[in-house]
Amino acid sequence: MILVCCATSVFARHTRIYGYVTDSDNRGIELVNVFARCEQQEGTSTNRNGFYELMIECQDTVQLEFSMLGYATVRQRLIRPNEVVNINVELTTETEWLQEVEVRGIQHQTGTLDQIDASAARVMPDATGGSIESILITFAGVNQNNELSSQYNVRGGSFDENEVYVNGIEVHRPLLIRSGQQEGLSFVNPEMVQNVQFSAGGFDAKYGDKMASVLDIEYKQPDRFEASLSASLLGANLYVGHGDSTYSQMHGIRYKTSQYMLGGLSTAGNYQPNFVDYQTYLTWQVGRQKTKDRFAQRQKTNPWTMSFLGNFSMNDYRFRPDSLSESFGGQNARSLNIWYEGQEKDRFLTGFAALSARGKVSREVELGFDLSGFYTHEQENFDITGEYVLSAGGEDSEQSNTHTAEVDPAAGQSQVLGTGIFHQHARNLLRAGVITLAHHGEWTHGRNRLRWGVSGQAELIRDHISEWQWRDSAGYSLPQAGPAMELYYSMRGDSAMQSARVQGYVQNTYRWLTDHGQVSLTVGGRLQWWSWNNEVLPSPRASVVWFPGWKHDFSFRLATGLYYQAPFYKELRDTLTDALGITRIRLNRDLRAQRSVHVVLGGDYYFRAWGRPFKLTAEAYYKYIDRMESYSVDNVRVRYSGKNDSEGYATGLDLKLYGELVPGVDSWISFSAMRARQRLMANGEGLKGEWIPSPQEQRYAFSMLFQDYLPQLPQLRFHLKMLFQDGMPYYAPRNNQSWGRMPMYKRIDLGASYAFNRKTARFMRAESAKHVKQWTIQFEVFNLVGWKNVNSYFWVSDAYNQQWASPNYLTGRRFNLKVTVDLQ
């Protein structure tokens, strides 16, 4: 309350003017120039929804002017305005529109790609420290069940079925990551992002051979100095950008430590995670002379632009577990207590570099060339022993954190169902390198937009894996089959792969007007060849978008195509088990790409409510997958069978309501319903078993991202992220036909931020703060309600050889304080 009162007194002499600029059809107009004149002059422009906001210091009359090419200028006078003034303006056209031109307040979706506001990642509460993925998981059809990870699954697909592009270049992730605790920073640095687009299915042929989704990110090119520095309990970020009319540069350094977050896990111990990331993006426009007249430069044919994108990341994870005490089972309660010895040491080093050249050779033709390389060196080492006691009794873990064992009144002791010792061991080393040379182009002529591309890729991977687990008992808790002690689990292998890929695509978009509205048709195809199995993959794709003439506030789209999930190294690892129970890895040269037929039908409805723009999106989809490769999921590790041994399908409905619940700030709610099933094949001949849930099936999901502020105090904002998702299926060890379902994943993250700038805080006008654009202080509460979410299970057996699944819980309630300084 004291802070609010003080802040109010600071900006009491200023007037905040805000509102919407619309056309005669009540649609917001983007890029309208808004000027306010009094003792000083302030200016701004409207956003894509027609919203504007400015602050001006004035004691008397304010002159307002709204202007845009093609519209009549509107002027208004405010005499001694209040501290907060809302003015909505309607502009009328003063010229005759060409038939082909449409002006819309909210950009209409002309395909399956949806826009994402990257700026929200700076202020949204996020347990990973701030990432684009933290916004993405609130979209319809996108799910995540681990707040420590930036990985996500889309419409029943696995983590590996999602493709990520930065400036048109595909980026890769480390391969050995098995848990969210090991996972470091997302590749994408939100401070460097200009534009983000996402498709949950039915995407165009220009995007690669993945079956689930595409995340397409474009980095910005600053034309002046800008910088930011932020620090919190989860790490620190430093960003610097600079540029002019001929060059630009950006540098970002991020440090993340999740030690504080990991303190809320079920397993007590000494966590030492440290993650560092450096990223740079440099551009240089060849042949352009320096000038301050950027408008004059834009009138000329664009010169060739050279760019370099570089990234280096180091994930260092050390863990020394101490103990675990957990209750589970509800009415048939059980208690599990484990005492650990040993430690885990993991290190993941990843480097990425891309050199690009892009230029217009004519007014209609644009060409581009890319040379990129990716290298990863991953080590995973642990030796951990544990002694466990499984007891009857204990309180339901959903109701209490207190762990007790049932006491036998006659014996006066707990009813111990099983005791034992286990030892987990791993010495895994993987080195992988990928080099890609690509060309792409675009030809725009009339109503046609033709795109094409071709690339060659070389892959070299060496992998050594040695991991096993054995379990012993006191002679009764695990039934003995003989004098020899068999390993509970073992996997060994030394593999090397050297391969080449060639792929290309061509697609054309044709737009035309009919008596029934505007139509946009995109038709294209991809072709890929891989030297490992000599497989050729043809992938035809098509989509059509219709803007009906009878109602400009609607649009409808249909997309379909044949999609392939071309295997990479992880999918190739087939296994053979010998008589001693040791599983050995071999690379399967007969493995074929998974194949999927997609059909996506969707539509958008644009409307205004309470004087503000809204958009309702609905998409129904169906995917049938054959030549499917079954897999299991443990935490975030995906382990494939190495065989085309199953088939499956996914179908569902996604709904999203997007709009401005308060002026100038985006919010949305999403709902998804789906069904994803699979069934195993017997040696590729005939069907075996029944349809069972796919490992990533979540039958329903509700999410919300909400932002709010006080009209009299717009610099104080509140941010809410809410997730309610169906639990993931899980399967008993060595029996993938016996399955259950985890409890619902539910989570509420809340944040509040306060921004200080020259217009709202007197101390920001001091000479010493002239290079400071804004200070932002943010307080966050993760998992506000303190729900205990399950991520995976630890399986133990009692004396009767009955298996029990002890849940591994994720983080509880945590608090975070973050300070951000923006420089200019």
Model regions: which residues?
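Transmembrane beta-barrel wall of Gram-negative outer-membrane proteins
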Residues: 228, 232-255, 268-320, 343-369, ...
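Structural signature of Gram-negative outer-membrane beta-barrels, strongest in the C-terminal barrel
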Residues: 46, 432-434, 455, 492-615, ...
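Membrane-embedded beta-barrel scaffold of Gram-negative outer-membrane proteins
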Residues: 368-372, 379, 590-649, 777-782, ...
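C-terminal beta-signal and adjacent terminal beta-strands/loops
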Residues: 723-731, 754-824
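Short, acidic Ser/Thr/Gly-rich low-complexity loop/linker segments typical of extracellular
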Residues: 39-51
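Short, acidic, small-residue-rich periplasmic hinge/interaction motif at the N-terminus
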Residues: 22, 32-37, 65-72, 81-125, ...
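Gram-negative outer-membrane beta-barrel transporters
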Residues: 511-517, 621-624, 643-730, 820
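Periplasmic N-terminal accessory/gating domains of Gram-negative outer-membrane beta-barrel systems
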Residues: 72, 85, 107-162, 166-203, ...
